[in-house]
């Protein structure tokens, strides 16, 4: 049976009035899923690819709703939730996965059954929990090169061990994953393999059950990767049906991501319900370099620095009162992001510009982002076959930004707060360096619908939401 998360409970996917594709751990193992991109081919109306010019940055779309940008301040249209924690940026999302309990892909607007609202849909990633019995698992795989004249082997090692630390009170789990990929392509400009990547993930989890009605589940993970930049093919040079690539800047991606979550579940007699609290923290430090023009010439090369620090908390209650299933909750999210972009373009120096100064493009931005949300939904059974769906959400968002235009200027860093946002550009007379701004938004969004069970195996449903 494939299940999906509805409210705080787990239900058969056939009974949930949401367009959802769910994968349990056995299915994920059978499909050999090691990243989200792998699921694009098993899910209708869903694309989980990355942005071609920025490795690891999500370009997710569901039912045609998505974005195609590496700018981290653009909010995700498709929300990614890891162990119930919303990931606030697209950067550092398309990365390796292991030891998964389930993945659920929800199509359409979300926001009444869990914290953050999204317009295109949501991807719910649930990593493996500690077990009350001793278990271990290890796997080693080697993928050989497809062709003798390009690429190298792709080797993956992973292991998990789980079991009770204090019987009936405390369970623990530890997992480690390492991938060494020699690359899939050959760079014809240098005769080297292209696409090399090293990735290491270490994850620990503890589950504490002080009483029969109270459970704490904490997880901590560190993700590090070092790889070449994106593998771009310029079709003005090579046929699109070939694997030929020639670039003079193989680029790089350096990622260091720390993630933690703490989930608390308290069973209460009120409505035979559950109070759930989910706290999440994520910190990202990333640097990149990419050959955007995808040629052996220096026409457009780009580098970036990116940092993110986010904190979130979601508190919700889910219970049943006679014919009504009720979910209510509140959500708080805050993040600080900083992004520096550097561009190497073959632009002509102005006449008289000193040869001792670098003519390079620098700029970027910093953003403080805060979100509050209150949400609720009631599923009321009019009959044994017909259920009404009624929901309401209030959301408030605030953004505070400092921007430095990406223009020729002395070397600076938004991450290190050395790029000016006021005054004028010393390289271009009269041009402002940037600006600062602040704005906020609030909205009440309703949801109404009907669900009808024709048979035990067939349902019809329709919903309206703003």
Language-model features, listed with the residues they occupy:
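N-terminal plug
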Residues: 3-18, 22-55, 68-73, 87-95, ...
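Outer-membrane beta-barrel channels and translocator barrels
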Residues: 33, 165-168, 179, 209-213, ...
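Outer-membrane beta-barrel translocator/receptor signature
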Residues: 75-77, 89, 98-107, 112-187, ...
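Membrane-embedded beta-strand positions of outer-membrane beta-barrel proteins
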Residues: 136-140, 174-176, 204, 218, ...
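Transmembrane beta-strands of outer-membrane beta-barrel pores
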Residues: 142-146, 178-182, 220-226, 281-285, ...
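Solvent-exposed loop segments that connect transmembrane elements
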Residues: 185-193, 228-248, 291-302, 340-364, ...
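Outer-membrane beta-barrel domain signature, strongest for Gram-negative TonB-dependent receptors
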Residues: 191, 195-327, 333-336
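Structural signature of Gram-negative outer-membrane beta-barrels, strongest in the C-terminal barrel
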Residues: 207-211, 317, 323, 331-333, ...
């Amino acid at each position: 049976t494939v299940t999906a998360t509805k409210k705080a409970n787990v239900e058969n996917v056939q009974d949930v009035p949401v367009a959802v594709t769910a994968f349990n751990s056995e299915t994920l193992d059978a499909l050999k899923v090691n990243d989200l991109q792998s699921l694009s081919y098993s899910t209708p109306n869903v694309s989980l690819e990355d942005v071609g010019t920025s490795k690891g940055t999500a370009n997710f779309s569901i039912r045609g709703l998505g974005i195609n940008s590496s700018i981290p301040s653009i909010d995700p249209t498709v929300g990614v939730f890891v162990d119930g924690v919303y990931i606030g940026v697209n950067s550092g999302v398309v990365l390796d996965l292991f030891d998964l309990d389930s993945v659920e892909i929800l199509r359409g607007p979300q926001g009444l059954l869990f914290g953050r609202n999204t317009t295109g849909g949501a991807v719910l990633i649930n990593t493996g929990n500690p077990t009350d019995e001793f278990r271990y698992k290890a796997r080693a795989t080697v993928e050989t090169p497809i062709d003798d004249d390009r690429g190298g082997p792709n080797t993956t090692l992973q292991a998990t061990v789980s079991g009770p630390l204090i019987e009936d009170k405390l369970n623990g789990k530890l997992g480690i994953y390492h991938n060494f990929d020699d690359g899939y392509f050959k760079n014809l400009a240098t005769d080297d393999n292209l696409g090399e990547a090293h990735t290491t993930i270490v994850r620990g989890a503890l589950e504490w059950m002080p009483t029969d009605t109270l459970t704490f589940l904490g997880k901590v993970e560190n993700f590090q990767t070092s790889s070449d930049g994106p593998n771009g093919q310029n079709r003005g040079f090579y046929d699109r049906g070939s694997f030929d690539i020639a670039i003079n800047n193989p680029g790089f991606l350096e990622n260091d991501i720390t993630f933690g979550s703490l989930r608390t579940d308290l069973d209460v007699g009120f409505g035979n319900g559950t109070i759930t609290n989910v706290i999440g923290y994520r910190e990202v430090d990333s640097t990149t370099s990419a050959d955007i023009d995808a040629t052996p010439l220096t026409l457009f090369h780009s580098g970036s620095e990116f940092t993110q620090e986010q904190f979130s908390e979601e508190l919700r209650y889910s219970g049943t009162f006679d014919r009504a299933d009720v979910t209510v909750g509140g959500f708080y999210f805050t993040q600080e992001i900083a992004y520096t972009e550097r561009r190497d373009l073959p632009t002509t120096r102005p006449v008289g510009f000193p040869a001792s100064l670098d003519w390079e493009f620098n700029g970027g931005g910093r953003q403080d982002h805060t979100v509050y949300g209150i949400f609720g939904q009631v599923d009321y059974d009019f009959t044994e076959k017909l259920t009404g769906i009624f929901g309401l959400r209030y959301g408030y968002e605030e953004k505070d930004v400092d921007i430095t235009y990406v223009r020729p200027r002395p070397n600076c860093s938004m991450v290190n707060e050395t790029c000016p946002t006021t005054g004028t550009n010393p390289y271009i007379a009269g041009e402002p360096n940037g600006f600062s701004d602040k704005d906020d938004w609030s909205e009440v969004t309703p949801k109404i619908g009907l669900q009808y069970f024709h048979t035990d195996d067939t349902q019809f449903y329709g919903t309206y939401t703003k």
